Amino acid sequence: MDGEQEARVVALVCSSPPQGYARWSLRLLADQVVQLKIIQDISHETIRQVLEDNELKPWRKQEWCIPPQANAEFVYHMEDILDVYKRPADPKHPLVCFDESPEQLVRETRQAIPMQIGQLERYDYEYQREGVANLFMFFAPLQNWRTVKVTDRRTKTDWAHCMRDLVEIHFPDAETIAVVQDQLNTHSPACLYEVFPPTKAKQILDRLEFHSTPKHGSWLNMAEIEFSVLNRQCLNRCIPSQADLMRETETWASLRNHKQATVNWQFTNKDARIKLIRLYPSIDA
């Protein structure tokens, strides 16, 4: 196979598979290469070598948060968040990243068989759904602190109570709290006036400084990283009830706080203007 033929094979691999197929396989690629007369005859092993040489894995794909192109609104919110992340630690002005996530409650219908020497733990494929709970994550990276609140739902009332807890329980001595959160319709300061008396709502809001991630840019929220850790370390199993979920997440947060675990965020606006230049609108001189 010469260079031109290999380039055509690579282009074929990077295209959509033919109708009736969800993805490319080695043998399907070999058949298509012959049908398209790229080469007279080729084995699936040769195809495998071409894929390996070009670091192509058509059997794999990755879910990704794909941002818009040349979008000033996205850039504005991104640079605002990255500026907030550069602030030094200050107990009077803490940074708190806030996020939420649903959690399916699941009960096993049969007792799992424990792991033994030479044998993996085995569990039955049947399970019983026990409803859905909601998790609110509070994460202060500069204080190496986090906590998880479990609720029935994720309404604007629940969000308003979380903001009250942030001010009155978690950081009662802070003057202002910078809150990084996603752009959701329930994350509106106006919601506090629907839940609390005006005086109370104003007292809470006067101590909060909101910074929203761009739409389709939730990867900028460090609380999402903490949720990823929580899912891997704690939630990747059957948890049957909200009470069990509360106990497990409280224990996880307590142990992680004790270890002073945090996120070492390094990405800056300077990096963004180089690596994510496609997000920035072009300006004619």
Summary of predicted features, one role per range:
Residues 146, 215, 223-242, 255-259:
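Active-site proximal helix-loop segment of RNase H-like, two-metal nucleases, encompassing DDE(D)
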Residues 157-178:
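Short, basic/hydrophobic alpha-helical segments
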Residues 49-62:
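Short, basic alpha-helical nucleic acid-contact segments in DNA-binding proteins
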Residues 122-127, 200-222, 237-241:
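RNase H-like polynucleotidyl transferase catalytic core
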Residues 1-42, 88-89:
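A short, amphipathic alpha-helix used for macromolecular contacts
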Residues 109, 244-285:
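C-terminal domain-tail junction helix/linker
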Residues 174-188:
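Acidic/histidine-rich, metal-coordinating catalytic segments
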Residues 77-164, 276-277:
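Extended, low-complexity cationic-aromatic segments
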